[in-house]
């Protein structure tokens, strides 16, 4: 039997995608819409207070295309906190006009196809920064879920640890070419959601998503073993832009 890779696990993660019922939103009076926006921004302010204390993080992006209109990405120490945040959002007036489109539950993950050592990895500052990240404030985001193939001779889980380590090392070298252009956060979701991993890419240049994903398709680990779900691409929505975005 092949050896399972050990993982380092950090904050729990929720990607919450919503579509907006614009027709229903327009039926409110201007005062009602403004009150709903203020209530929502008050909730986001609480999220920001948590982030300022480095006890979690969040990002809000508008989504391009018809899969969704808005994405909330939330990081918290426990899965209960994610549930509480989702419930608090659902209790707002604005949520009456937010239609669930897609969601993804996972946990920030570093796999150790890493070198082993005597030091506790959870005490290494760089490892902690990656397991408990403050989300980048880039202009654009790209999220997609993925699996490793388990078909015929292309069964990732039948490969030896050394084979998997070598394939992932080559894959990582491709990713390093985009250092400074794209920031990647990998979240593990085996047993938590329908795919095995979620990949969230952040960049100030959306074209870099295409370039990175395309180049990685030629890595053997992706060409032979990668299977992908839907891609969601969006633009950052700051608190200052929320009233403009929701103006009708």
Swiss-Prot record:
Q: Which reaction does it catalyse?
A: Fe-coproporphyrin III + 2 H2O2 + 2 H(+) = heme b + 2 CO2 + 4 H2O; Fe-coproporphyrin III + H2O2 + H(+) = harderoheme III + CO2 + 2 H2O; harderoheme III + H2O2 + H(+) = heme b + CO2 + 2 H2O
Do you know which HAMAP family this protein is assigned to? Coproheme_decarbox_1
What is the species of this protein? Geobacillus sp. (strain WCH70)
Check the record and name the InterPro entries matching this protein: CHDC (IPR031332), ChdC/CLD (IPR010644), Dimeric_a/b-barrel (IPR011008)
Describe cofactor binding as the record notes it. Fe-coproporphyrin III acts both as a substrate and a redox cofactor.
Residues annotated as coiled-coil are none
- Any keyword Translocase? no
- Descriptive protein name: Coproheme decarboxylase
Record: residues binding Fe-coproporphyrin III: 130, 144-148, 171, 184, 222
Q: In which pathway does it act?
A: Porphyrin-containing compound metabolism; protoheme biosynthesis
Cofactor(s) needed by this chain: Fe-coproporphyrin III
Homology family: Belongs to the ChdC family. Type 1 subfamily.
The enzyme's first-digit EC class, named in words, is oxidoreductase
Gene Ontology annotations of biological process type: heme B biosynthetic process
> What NCBIfam families is this protein classified in?
PRK12276.1 (NF008913)
Q: What does this protein do?
A: Involved in coproporphyrin-dependent heme b biosynthesis. Catalyzes the decarboxylation of Fe-coproporphyrin III (coproheme) to heme b (protoheme IX), the last step of the pathway. The reaction occurs in a stepwise manner with a three-propionate intermediate.
UniProt keyword Heme, yes or no:
yes
Active-site residues?
144
| Keywords associated with the record | Heme, Heme biosynthesis, Iron, Metal-binding, Oxidoreductase
Known EC number: 1.3.98.5
């Amino acid at each position: 039997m092949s050896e399972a890779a050990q993982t380092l696990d950090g904050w729990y993660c929720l990607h919450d995608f919503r579509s907006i019922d614009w027709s229903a939103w327009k039926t409110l009076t201007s005062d009602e819409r403004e009150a709903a926006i203020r209530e929502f921004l008050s909730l986001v302010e609480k999220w920001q207070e948590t982030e300022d204390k480095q006890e979690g993080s969040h990002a809000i992006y508008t989504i391009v295309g018809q899969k969704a209109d808005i994405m909330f990405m939330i990081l918290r120490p426990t899965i209960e906190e994610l549930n509480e945040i989702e419930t608090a959002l659902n209790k707002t007036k604005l949520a009456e006009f937010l239609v669930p489109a897609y969601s993804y539950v996972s946990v920030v993950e570093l796999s150790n196809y890493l070198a082993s050592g005597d030091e506790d990895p959870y005490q290494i500052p760089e490892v902690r920064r990656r397991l408990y990240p403050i989300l980048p404030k880039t202009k654009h985001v790209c999220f997609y879920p993925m699996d490793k193939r388990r078909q015929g001779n292309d069964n990732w889980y039948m490969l030896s640890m050394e084979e998997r380590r070598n394939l992932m090392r080559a894959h990582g070298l491709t990713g390093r070419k985009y250092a400074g252009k794209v920031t990647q956060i990998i979240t593990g979701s085996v047993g938590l959601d329908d795919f095995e991993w979620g990949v969230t890419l952040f960049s100030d240049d959306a074209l870099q998503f295409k370039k990175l994903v395309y180049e990685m398709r030629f890595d053997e680990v992706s060409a032979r073993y990668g299977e992908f779900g839907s891609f969601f691409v969006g633009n950052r929505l700051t608190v200052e832009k929320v009233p403009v975005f929701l103006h009708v």
